[in-house]
Amino acid sequence: MMEFTCNICGKRNRTASRELGREEASCAECGSSVRMRGLLRALSNEIFGMSLTLPEFPRVKSLRGLGLSDSPQYADQLALKFDYRNTFHDREPILDLGDPPGLELGTYDFIVSSEVFEHVSPPASNAFENAFRLLKPAGVLVLTAPYSIGGDTKEHFTGLREFGLAQVGDRVLLVNRTARGEIEVHDNLVFHFGASGPALEMREFSESGLRNELTRAGFGEVRIYSDSFPAFGVVSSESWSLPIASRKGAFRFSREATRDVIEQWARCQKNCREWAGSLWVRLGSKLGFVDLTPLLERQQNIVHKR
């Protein structure tokens, strides 16, 4: 058995290590999976330089974030912490990664995407390039996507032009009209189910293929979070399909974001002093019921790391 703190809801969990699969719900409180917790841990490290639980994130409304069909398990909390909005490809608020609004280009500090890029219409390079264009010069894309270690990316459908899905009995077919006007019919489709419902798998990435897409789009640094982080229940038994952070440039806080963090830190300091100085806490400390040391040490660690 192992114990961990879910970095999405902040609750303590105790579970068997074998139950910590990439997709299986393993937090008894919010139902988060290893994939979700790994994604949010990567986001925390990329923005704050340390692994914080989502409830511990400072409220920095001057940082603008974009979600691509993010799960409500963390999307709702991100909206409380940042100037963040979640979008979808099939319902409002809609964002077409193949053709994003021009006014939004270069306006986001971070983009969060989990299991999206394997579903975008070909060519996939168009979606990666537009994600790059949506970010500010110092922005970061944090994503997960299924990928294999060796080989090349496998595109399931080449030459898609005018296409759609058709239900024939109990089968779903993809029907495409090519550039030459020929009709193609594809069977044996693979669908994944996520926040937006069923989504057609367009490709199977390889690690090298995914890295190449990101670097060709312009990202200067691509980091795969291959290390486990048991404290958050992020245990990677496989070496594939791990969280990835792709930086457009060196991330830095704006003056507004820095002010937001400092103001919150000052309020935290004040509240901690008032709490530690209360009569009941001081009495409990003297009687051995309350230990202030961990609180004070954690407070100092956060100050030094920032």
Task: For the regions a language model picked out, list residue spans one by one.
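S-adenosyl-L-methionine-dependent methyltransferase catalytic module, highlighting the catalytic core
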Residues: 4, 122-267
